[in-house]
From Swiss-Prot:
Its EC number is 2.1.1.-, 3.6.4.13. Its main location: host cell. Residues 835-1109 are annotated as: Helicase. Residues 81-305 form the Alphavirus-like MT domain. This is Replication protein alpha-A. Keywords: ATP-binding, Hydrolase, Methyltransferase, Nucleotide-binding, Transferase.
Length: 1139
């Protein structure tokens, strides 16, 4: 026991621990080395784990490692880093402001909370916090405010005009800001400005006191102020909070504590700033900032520190100083009006508080410093490091009287300035003191030691004399006899001091050399007399029922799991449970078969008075559809009746094809079904083939999803670095914390209407044997405007879910199930089919606009963008309201999915780009509309309908041209003269086998150019693609498009400016560059068996210039660039094609 005590005493000694650490770190073979390394590793691992769980904040500024460490120390709750991608003045102040904003926002709730940010950076909120309701009050009260507004406007324009992807909600706010600024400008010019005009969505130009922004109903209201209350009187601030119904607000401001004890100027070390008190105002400025500083009223500024109670007309607020971080004071202001009522009820008449403001740490001391000023001695006080002063005092105490020397002391102080000796080594610590202060400190310590030695000698002499003789009567009674009252003594001292000054003598105060501790805090007392007034604030109710249910469910799952594990370990399973064990799985399967179809049917049924339960009626759910493929109107509510449906494999394995609705089960793969039998009616054959094509598409898409699930099961998808087919994302309920596996999808990657729900029952070699179930289920997403949440509402909380490209809309499945019923009732009937066969740019859409009686006829389009454009043109020209336009101008998918009153009726309808879709789909449109006449717009020379299912051949995808009325249009308003000549020379357009001449109204004569291996301006790889922002880029293949996007988007080209030829059909652009990046032959490349339509579409999208860039000299390049090609043909040859 004694030895243990000795060891503990030794270890507690600083020099022993230093030697131990030195030995352990220098001697690798020492056992202490392993112990030290293990301990350090444990500490590092602990720090890493804590850092992972912390919120990551990138301050972005270019700062030093010491400054970054200061930020980390000030905000330990964040994992602070810097990408060093920005630079500017007062960088540390900017970094602290960013972290202060995050810290204040973390103090307030997120869900259904409206935050006023007084004077906040609205663009920063708009860019980084688009998911929160934050409104900034940014009035223009000075020239600097106007400059700050324009700076933020420029930053917004720079970001919005950049190449990065942006959420849709950001675009909406961007447009609103520009509209609001235009309205404000108009109001100022007209002299009709008021608070309503200055209001805005993202920010307003009113002061916080005058802000009129309406808060969404049911939202909690709060406010933050990041360095913005300096010029707002605390009484006005509290009154504004009361008017807006804000019960608690948070803020922060720069605060040098020394200003409370009268220090007129000083530094703000954390932000590298300074403050100066002058003429009743306090000024702040920064060391490395040449810009204008900030000046504020000192009295109003100090009220935020000195006051605890803020008395206003209709209530009382209390200010709580929470903490100091760096040079910033955080505060909280709370509505405490309710306390007045409570205290009045209890008979209390007043309330009193005190608070202590910390000033300085105990690491410094106040030292008197001496200097000459105009031939007189000047004494000042300095705040110097305690360590340096104590080291200097200890050093001079060791010297003998004859060795006392100011020069030696200065030498020593200079050597130990901001350092001390530890374990035989010099350790740097603190801030280095200036040389002039070192010199003054040496004089002070020298004089102090002289005076102290004199005092010590006097004390010793006194006691020596007293101890040499015995006390007598005089010694005993002398003090009593010569007693002088304090009043007379004081008078004598004053007379003595005056006489000495009269004769030129000075009385020296021996306490002048004393070194004192500085003031550590300032105590502030505040009192308030209880007066009952104002109204008591009430809080907003937030419905957190779902979160509570989820918590209880997780707790129940934990308890059930613990009980089952304990029963399995102890073997305490009851006999009844053992007997029921074999029956559990069959019972589950029966319940699924009985309950799930009814549930899915109810969720998918179209909304009607007889169907009270649908997806919209579920609280908190919002059906979502793709913004590129769905319609705005009510017909987009896709439904799928499950009753009477069968799995795909049951239809596919039959000998003869019988169309029947498909259910959601996809737990088995299957081959393609047999083709439908051919009848004598071309139109009926087309209908049957379109249904067959839709069925094959569903089978193919589901097989692709099962392949992705198979990759997931075999751990081929094991991290977010792996490129997942179909852009699939997996969500798991297998753990206690459900969530996305590997990677959370971004806001642009969500919005799927369906997901595949699956789980595994065994670990087998075959996927179908391993699956417990696998089915398609509807899901919903929370929406706010165009913003979509990243986690959907799943119908069940177990197993796995996968969303991918094939579950975005599932239109093939929905359309097939809709048309099965239509096909069963349809009969062959005569239809008049007229085709307007026009060259590119002949005005087919304009012809629809001019010839269609939209109130009696219907317009159907193949693509969403073209149909939307056509609908808007109808609304402008025919003065249609939105409801009528949405009802009678439809996309193909929208019409085929519609039911009941959502389907318009018409004897005749127009079909834009009819040859890009299957002829059977057009027949079904006629059946649903009840039409007998079809006026179709198309171009037989351009791209036809493309079969997306491999392994099947379509025979009835085009109209029966022998029974079709064909009306050719050979005049274009788009293509230049050389393109018209080229289309005519290559005989792309014929009428009854006779080549036709294509003409154009475009005055541009030469537009076709080419670059290849042998051209003067060579093109051999992707790196040779010219970068132009006013150009649209085309490719033949999707793989080429992706390569082009990865090369051009980082260089400023927009994503929308790159597409395949098939995607660009119907589009018009001024300048076009067509790129071929693969040398290997392909049937759609120029010269291939299917290349003609691609050449026609690719060369006819432009109005000014077309450049073909190919890595090989194919047919199109030779047609343009070869000797005798278009590029060398005289311009006068093209003039005959221009009218």
């Amino acid at each position: 026991m004694a030895s243990d005590e000795i060891v503990r005493n030794l270890i507690s000694r600083e020099e022993v621990m230093g030697n131990l650490i030195s030995t352990a770190s220098s001697s690798v073979r020492s056992p202490l080395h392993d112990v030290l390394c293990s301990h350090v590793r444990t500490i590092v691992d602990s720090v890493d784990k804590k850092a992972v769980s912390r919120k990551h904040e990138d301050v972005r500024r270019n700062i030093s490692s010491e400054e970054l460490q200061m930020l980390i120390n000030a905000y330990p709750e964040y994992a602070v880093s810097s990408s060093a991608c920005e630079s500017g003045t007062h960088s540390m102040a900017a970094c602290f402001r960013f972290l202060e904003t995050e810290y204040l926002l973390d103090m307030v709730p997120m869900k259904e909370t409206f935050v006023y940010d007084i004077g906040g950076n609205w663009f920063s909120h708009m860019k980084f916090r688009a998911d929160r309701e934050i409104h900034c009050c940014c009035p223009i009260l000075s020239m600097r405010d106007s400059e700050r507004l324009e700076t933020r406007m420029m930053a917004m324009q720079k970001y919005m005009r950049g190449s990065k992807d942006k959420p849709l909600r950001l675009l909406s706010r961007y447009q609103n800001i520009l509209r609001e600024q235009a309205a404000r400008t108009t109001a100022f010019m007209a002299g009709e400005v008021n608070a309503g005009v200055l209001d805005g969505d993202v920010f307003c130009e009113n002061t916080f006191q005058d802000c009129v922004r309406r808060v969404p109903e049911g939202f909690l209201k709060t406010a933050i102020a990041v360095h913005s209350i300096y010029d707002i009187k605390v009484e006005e601030f509290a009154s504004a909070l009361k008017r807006k119904g804000i019960t608690q607000a948070y803020g922060c401001f720069l605060f040098p504590p020394a200003v409370l004890i009268g220090q007129k100027e000083g530094i703000l070390p954390s932000v590298d700033g300074h403050y100066l008190v002058e003429n009743g105002r306090i000024k702040f400025f920064f060391a490395n900032d040449p810009n204008a500083g900030y000046s504020h009223d000192l009295k109003d500024y100090l009220k935020y520190v000195e006051k605890t109670y803020v008395d206003i007309e209709d209530g009382v607020f209390a200010i709580e100083l929470m903490q100091m971080r760096g040079d910033t004071m955080f505060f909280k202001i709370t509505d405490v009006t309710a306390a007045m009522y409570h205290m009045k009820y209890r008979g209390m008449k007043r309330d009193e508080t005190f608070k202590c403001i910390p000033l300085l740490k105990n690491s410094s001391v106040v030292v008197p410093l001496f200097s000459w000023d105009n031939r007189s001695l000047k004494i000042t006080s300095g705040l110097l490091p305690r360590t340096l002063v104590e080291q200097g005092a200890a050093f001079i105490m060791k010297n003998k009287e004859k060795d006392l020397n100011v020069a030696v002391l200065k030498n020593y102080l200079s050597a130990v300035n901001n350092s001390y000796i530890f374990n035989g080594s010099q350790v740097r610590d603190g801030v280095k003191i200036a040389p002039d202060l070192i010199s003054k400190l040496a004089v002070t310590l020298y004089l102090r030691e002289k005076v102290y030695r004199q005092r010590e000698n006097s004390i010793i002499s006194y006691f020596e004399q007293e101890m040499l003789h015995d006390p007598n009567l005089k010694a005993m009674f002398g003090d009593f006899l010569w007693f002088v009252p304090n009043t007379l003594s004081s008078v004598w001292k004053n007379m003595r001091k005056s006489l000495m000054e009269w004769f030129g003598y000075a009385e020296f105060d021996l306490t002048t050399f004393d070194i004192c501790d500085p003031v550590l805090y300032v105590e502030i007392v505040d009192r308030y007399k209880i007066i009952q007034k104002g109204r008591i604030p009430l809080g907003e109710f937030f419905d957190c029922h779902e979160e509570c249910e989820n918590y209880e469910l997780r707790e129940k799952e934990k308890n059930d799991l613990a009980v089952k594990m304990a029963q399995k370990v102890t073997g305490t399973v009851t006999e009844c449970e053992k007997d029921l064990g074999p029956l559990v799985q069959p019972i589950k399967e029966i319940l699924v078969q009985l309950v799930m179809p009814n549930l899915v049917r109810a969720l998918c049924r179209p909304r009607s008075p007889t169907s009270p339960l649908d997806l919209k009626s579920i609280p908190g759910s919002t059906p979502s559809h793709s913004s590129s493929d769905s319609e705005h109107s009510m017909t987009e509510e896709a439904s799928c009746t499950i009753a009477g449906s069968v799995p795909t494999w049951e239809i596919a394995t039959r000998k003869d094809l019988t169309f029947q609705r498909i259910d959601e089960d996809m737990s088995r793969r299957t081959g393609m079904p047999p083709r439908p039998k051919v009848t004598s009616s071309y139109n009926m054959n087309a209908r049957a083939e379109f249904l067959y094509y839709q069925l094959c598409s569903v089978i193919c898409e589901r097989a692709q999803i099962l392949s992705v699930i198979e990759d997931f099961r075999q751990n081929l998808i094991f991290s977010d670095k792996v490129a997942v087919p179909l852009n699939a994302r997996f969500y798991s309920f297998q753990s206690l914390r459900p969530g996305w596996v590997f990677k959370t999808p971004s806001h642009s990657e969500v919005g799927h209407s369906y997901a595949v729900h699956f789980d595994f029952k065994t670990i087998g070699t075959d996927l179908e044997e391993s699956l417990a179930f696998c089915r398609m289920v509807p899901i919903s997403w929370d929406k706010s405007g165009k913003y979509i949440a990243t986690t959907p509402h799943f119908p069940e909380r177990h197993g796995y879910y996968v969303i991918c490209d094939n579950t975005k809309l599932c239109n093939n499945w929905l359309i097939y199930n809709k048309l099965v019923d239509v096909y069963a009732l349809v009969a062959d009937r005569p239809l008049r089919f007229e085709l307007i066969d026009g060259v590119p740019g002949c005005g087919k859409s304009t012809m629809i606009l001019n010839s269609c009686d939209i109130r009696r006829e219907v317009v159907v389009g193949e693509g969403r963008n073209a149909t939307d454009d056509l609908r808007e043109r109808f609304k402008r020209k025919k003065n249609l309201n939105s409801k009528t336009a949405n009802h009678r101008v439809r996309t193909l998918d929208s019409l085929l999915l519609a039911e009941g009153p959502c389907v318009p009726q018409a004897d005749r309808f127009h079909f834009d780009e009819a040859l890009k879709v299957h002829y059977g789909a057009i027949m079904f449109c006629a059946d649903k509309l009840g039409a007998s006449e079809i006026l179709a717009q198309g171009d037989r020379a351009q791209l036809p309908m493309i079969c997306r299912v491999e392994g099947i051949e379509l025979q009835f995808q085009s109209p029966d041209y022998t029974k079709t009325i064909i009306n050719p249009k050979l005049r274009s308003y788009r293509i230049p003269g050389d393109v018209a000549f080229y289309l005519s020379a290559k005989e792309f357009y014929k009428v009854k086998g006779i080549p036709q001449k294509v003409i154009t109204s475009n005055s541009v004569k030469r537009s076709l150019y080419a670059r290849g291996e042998t051209t003067p301006e060579r093109f051999v790889s992707l790196l040779d693609v010219p970068v132009r922002k006013d150009t649209h880029y085309l490719t033949f293949l999707q793989a080429e498009k992706e390569s082009l996007m990865s090369h051009l988007i980082p260089k400023g080209v927009k994503k929308e400016s790159i597409s395949t030829i098939h995607e660009a059909q119907g589009g018009t652009y001024e300048n076009v560059i067509l790129v071929r990046l693969q040398r290997t032959p392909n049937e759609i490349y120029p010269g291939g068996p299917r290349s003609a339509p691609y050449i026609v579409v690719g060369t006819s999208r432009h109005t000014k210039t077309f450049t073909y860039c190919s890595v090989t000299d194919d047919k199109l390049l030779l047609d343009i660039a070869d000797v005798g090609g278009i590029a060398h043909t005289p311009i006068r040859t093209f003039e005959s094609h221009i009218v």
